[in-house]
Amino acid sequence: MEVSRKKIYNPNSTESVNERKIFGGNPTSMFDLNKIKYQWADHLWKTMLANTWFAEEVSMNDDKRDYLKLSAEEKIGYDRALAQLIFMDSLQANNLIDNINPFITSPEINLCLVRQAYEEALHSHAYAVMVESISANTEEIYDMWRNDMQLKSKNDYIAQVYMELAKNPTEENILKALFANQILEGIYFYSGFSYFYTLARSGKMLGSAQMIRFIQRDEVTHLILFQNMINALRNERADLFTPQLINEVIGMFKKAVEIEALWGDYITQGKILGLTSSLIEQYIQFLADSRLSKVGIAKVYGVQHPIKWVESFSSFNEQRSNFFEARVSNYAKGSVSFDDF
């Protein structure tokens, strides 16, 4: 069944708060935020606001020097990992505004999606700061998304589901796009972040890793947003969650794991200390299992987290000695975890 985009002006709507739907509703398009159906969205909105940050807060002064000292393999990995993130945030900013939000008919969720789009744009600015601060290959990095065939092949697959929704906006394609967002936010991004943390663990590119920490904190809320939309739809539209669709979703996750494991090998070239091929693959499998279980789908791989130290590098939830500087920093403001929702 094809779904229409919501009206931007709809004074004849009589839809009550309890009648609101994730998609397929009939909203007035007024943001009456004194009436909330999806309380988790209101909580998430406030958390996203509390997490506000700016790229200029992060010092990149030492990264230019560090970059020059990286091995050839480390530089290649840095450039490739950064090029991947640049593409994904660019795609996601456009996808949210043009492709997802027009079909979502809950105003409190619309607000979260608009905020997420802003954060994706902020991340694009952060990457520009990183590129301009440390790399002599500015144009090369920004063109890599279509000139590097390994990356382009991956990007073609990532964009496929979103392009299908744009061409054929059915209920099933909207739902599959929500799952695709979960894969993007919860597997592809997380895998990319781990490379920067690996360098930082060796005392290299600490400003870049700090920037990634801020970005990852945002991505946690993005992942939770789509996770909760999917779970809310299970209650509203259980008829959409057919065995056939669930099998398709599992297939999407398996393909994502396969693609990301190959990409991880391509980034590291088997020459980055702390990131072997088996560790990369197991980490990606662990991420896939975690994302599936959060939306009521059985785990596929049954593996343990193989690089738990990554969590300590990305955590904002405790006061501890900052690994970037010899001082104690409190990052409690805006802290968020899956347990909060």
UniProtKB/Swiss-Prot annotation:
GO molecular function, one term: metal ion binding
Chain coiled-coil ranges: none
UniProt xrefs under Pfam families: Ribonuc_red_sm
Needed co-factor(s): Fe cation
EC top class named in words: oxidoreductase
Cofactor note as given: Binds 2 iron ions per subunit.
Residues the record lists as binding Fe cation 2: 120, 185, 219, 222
Active-site residues per Swiss-Prot or TrEMBL entry: 127
Binding locations of Fe cation 1: 89, 120, 123
GO biological process, one term: deoxyribonucleotide biosynthetic process
Tree of life domain: Bacteria
Keywords from the UniProt entry: Deoxyribonucleotide synthesis, Iron, Metal-binding, Oxidoreductase
Catalytic activity: a 2'-deoxyribonucleoside 5'-diphosphate + [thioredoxin]-disulfide + H2O = a ribonucleoside 5'-diphosphate + [thioredoxin]-dithiol
Assembly description: Tetramer of two alpha and two beta subunits.
NCBIfam families from the UniProt entry: PRK09614.1-3
Family: Belongs to the ribonucleoside diphosphate reductase small chain family.
UniProt protein name: Ribonucleoside-diphosphate reductase subunit beta
